[in-house]
């Protein structure tokens, strides 16, 4: 008979200890250790066969046959883009996001799309009743006879339904509400989340079922529960977007079967999440040519995306001055301000600086450095920028402008939307001299920040 012992497990990182501690040694959080009863099993293998290998004997990697993995399209081009072309049968996808951001709406819409293609779909809800799911399905126009719904939180009962129905797609909403009866801890605890996820993954891989699992987030936007959950699943998708914005970004932070650089853009409407295939045109539809506003072509994976960077620089009598941005990392913003003051001799250190990206988009790539600097300098000098111009490039600490990747794709996207000129790194300019006829744009190659500002802000 298995012995029982008491352990204190951190609900944030999964660290366990036989005695209670106020501060978790693993993650440094306070009051996160919760008492859990753990069974000790003897002479039992704790390994998990995920069903990925056909043989347990070692073989040369050159003899391993590689075949194209079949994919199920989800009916959403944006979601398929993030997944790498669709979801693979036998894989497990974790979707994480703030409450009300659209996780359940997206998964229910995917279920309806698969059911319409003749696939058998099982939607397991642990947070709502089947009536509530039906009401949302009516609003999303996602009612189909092959879409089966059950309200269940007991993992053993869920496994029974899966074995009986043999669905092609399984959705569990959410993993924090599911529990195993043989584990004596509350649903959502580290032990429950870990063991339930492992069991769902085993069922999915054994039966070749594509599985979507919805997860909650903490107040700082990270996955609620143990980080080991992200290691168990095949793909982790994070929903981004404020409650005051109708646009949602779906970003892959882990993907065993595709790129982690792709993003999907959706618009939240009354009928659910709608794909936004031409996001650049949408984000620039309300732009005005004012000082401090510049267009920056960013790249997410293979997708060029034009965004409007806005900067406001104002004198302030208060010390220290404020630096505020929800769209750009603050440390990066402070670095660019220091470069402007040291290398371009702008007396910007005593000013309040506010930077944002229209549409609630967050930009992290270095190629946006030059655009941010130009926008701040334009606002500081109160001078308009060259009309119909895009700006991109990485800025070094010495004030030099460095080359970035996929410059041609950025220019082609800008030319498609009617932009006529671009300020870009000199090295990219030299590489693209012969491409001018292809883009139809006038290119300005800048070697340093001062030269870029001279091109972007011509004297009136």
Language-model region placement:
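Conserved RecA-like ASCE P-loop NTPase motor core of nucleic-acid helicases/translocases
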Residues: 121-125
């Amino acid at each position: 008979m298995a012995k029982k012992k008491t352990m204190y497990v951190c609900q944030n990182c999964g660290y366990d200890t036989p005695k209670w501690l106020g501060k978790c040694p693993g993650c440094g959080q306070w009051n996160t250790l919760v008492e859990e009863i753990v069974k000790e099993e003897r002479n039992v293998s704790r390994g998990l066969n995920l069903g990925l290998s056909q043989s347990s004997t070692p073989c040369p990697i050159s003899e391993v046959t590689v075949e194209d993995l079949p994919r199920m399209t989800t009916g959403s081009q944006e979601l398929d883009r993030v997944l790498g072309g669709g979801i693979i049968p036998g894989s497990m996808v974790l979707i994480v996001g703030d409450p009300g951001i659209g996780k359940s709406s997206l998964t229910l819409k995917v279920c309806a799309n698969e059911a319409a293609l003749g696939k058998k779909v099982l939607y397991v809800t642990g947070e709502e009743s089947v009536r509530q799911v039906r009401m949302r399905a009516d609003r999303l126009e996602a009612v189909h006879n092959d879409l089966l719904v059950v309200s269940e939180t007991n993992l053993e009962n869920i496994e029974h339904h899966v074995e009986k129905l043999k669905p092609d797609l399984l959705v569990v909403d959410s993993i924090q509400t599911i529990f195993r009866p043989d584990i004596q801890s509350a649903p959502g605890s580290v032990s429950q989340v870990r063991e339930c996820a492992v069991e769902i993954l085993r069922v999915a891989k054994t039966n070749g079922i594509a599985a979507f699992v919805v997860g909650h987030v903490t107040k700082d936007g990270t996955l609620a529960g143990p980080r080991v959950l992200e290691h168990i699943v095949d793909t982790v998708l994070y929903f981004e977007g404020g409650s005051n914005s109708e646009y949602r970004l779906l970003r892959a932070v882990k993907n065993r079967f595709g790129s982690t650089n792709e993003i999907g853009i959706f618009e939240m409407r009354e009928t659910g999440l709608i794909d936004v295939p031409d996001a650049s045109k949408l984000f620039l539809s309300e732009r005005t040519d004012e000082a401090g506003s510049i267009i920056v072509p960013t790249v997410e994976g293979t997708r060029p995306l034009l965004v409007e960077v806005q900067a406001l620089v104002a004198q302030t009598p208060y010390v220290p001055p404020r630096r505020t941005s929800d769209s750009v990392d603050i440390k990066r913003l402070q670095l660019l301000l220091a470069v402007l003051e040291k290398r371009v001799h702008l007396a910007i250190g005593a000013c309040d600086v506010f930077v944002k990206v229209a549409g609630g988009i967050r930009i992290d790539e270095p190629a946006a450095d030059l655009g941010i600097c130009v926008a701040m300098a334009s606002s500081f000098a109160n001078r308009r920028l060259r009309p119909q111009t895009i700006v991109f490039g990485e800025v070094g600490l010495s004030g030099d402008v460095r080359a970035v990747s996929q410059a041609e794709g950025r220019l082609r996207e800008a030319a498609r939307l009617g932009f006529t000129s671009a300020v870009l790194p000199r090295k990219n300019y030299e590489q693209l001299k012969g491409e001018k006829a292809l883009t139809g744009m006038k290119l300005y190659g800048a070697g340093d920040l001062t030269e870029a500002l001279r091109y972007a802000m011509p004297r009136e």
